[in-house]
């Protein structure tokens, strides 16, 4: 677990308590319920599931300045469903990508690979769907889930150095991963995604953004204490995209009052405005 990972359980606990409070449960009751019921169950389940995961043989674990969720891999999909980020959210995210058969798709920070597998079904055998993540257990789960039923490919890699030639992909996706990167890596990492996209290629980002109302500001305020998430809540993602030379950058929608979808285009003639 890297130095930022300990923020994750506390943030998840705070969000879970906030949801319980919206249901009329008092603060201390909500926190106690989460601590006594949710956390031990998740820890025990995670230990059980982790013991059965295949290990990535002969693969070098990439170094990254971002936060990885290696420890969360066994129950990541369950937590996503709990927070309303399950299959319907992934399908909505892919609709913003407008994928076509035969296209080459890159999922940066793919986690357990749900988006990558869905994309593989769209681009078909004439296309390519690749997911990368720096967390070995995430990649192990992704490969296990894709075995025998998907053309998706998964690689252990970090956004600092994407293991692909320049201009390799038509579409890239960064779903709920930029808030795991410090500000300087957001900028550098988006530049690396820009490099591997073809001219005219599109990047779809969905991530934390400025809360839409005072209630969500109240629930999200702990995230302002973390440099990785603070820039998201200040509404800076479009600026990072433009700094990486994407042009134009469009906002395509909102979800849950806290998430925004963006589409960013690599110009047909890089270096010139589109």
Language-model-derived ranges and their functions:
Residues 187-199:
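A short glycine-rich, Lys/Arg-flanked "PGG" loop and its adjoining helix->strand segment in the class I
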Residues 160-171:
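A short acidic, Gly/Pro-enriched loop at the edge of an enzyme's catalytic core
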Residues 106-108, 112-161:
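Class I SAM-dependent methyltransferase SAM/SAH-binding core
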Residues 18-63:
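N-terminal auxiliary segments of SAM/dcSAM-dependent transferases
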Residues 171-184:
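A short SAM/SAH-binding and catalytic strip from SAM-dependent methyltransferases
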Residues 124, 181-182, 197-198:
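Helix-to-beta-strand junctions that scaffold the AdoMet/dcAdoMet cofactor pocket
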Residues 46-98, 114, 220, 224:
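Conserved class I S-adenosyl-L-methionine
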Residues 60-63, 83, 187, 204-244, ...:
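C-terminal alpha-helical "lid/dimerization" subdomain adjacent to the S-adenosyl-L-methionine
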């Amino acid at each position: 677990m890297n130095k930022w990972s300990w923020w994750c359980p506390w943030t998840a606990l705070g969000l879970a308590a906030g949801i319980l409070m919206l249901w009329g449960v008092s603060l201390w009751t909500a926190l106690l319920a989460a601590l006594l019921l949710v956390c031990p169950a998740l820890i025990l389940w995670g230990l059980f599931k982790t013991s059965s995961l295949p290990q990535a043989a002969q693969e070098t674990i990439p170094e990254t300045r971002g936060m990885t969720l290696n420890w969360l891999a066994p129950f990541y999909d369950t937590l996503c469903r709990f927070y309303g980020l399950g299959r319907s959210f992934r399908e909505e995210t892919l609709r913003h990508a407008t994928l076509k058969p035969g296209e080459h798709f890159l999922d940066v920070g793919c986690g357990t690979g749900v988006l990558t597998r869905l994309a593989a079904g769209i681009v078909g055998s004439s296309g390519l769907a690749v997911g990368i993540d720096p967390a070995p257990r995430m990649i192990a789960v992704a490969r296990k889930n894709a075995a025998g039923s998907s053309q998706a490919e998964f690689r252990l890699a970090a956004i600092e150095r994407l293991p692909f030639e320049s201009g390799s992909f038509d579409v890239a996706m960064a779903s709920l991963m930029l808030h795991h990167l410090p500000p300087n890596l957001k900028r550098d990492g988006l530049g690396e995604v820009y490099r591997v996209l073809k001219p005219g290629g599109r990047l779809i980002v969905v991530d934390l953004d400025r809360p839409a109302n005072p209630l969500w500001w109240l629930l999200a305020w702990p995230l302002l204490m973390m440099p990785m998430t603070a820039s998201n809540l200040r509404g800076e993602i479009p600026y990072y995209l433009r700094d990486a030379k994407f042009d134009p950058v469009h906002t395509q929608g909102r979800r849950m009052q806290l998430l925004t979808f963006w589409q960013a285009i690599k110009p047909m003639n890089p270096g010139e405005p589109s």
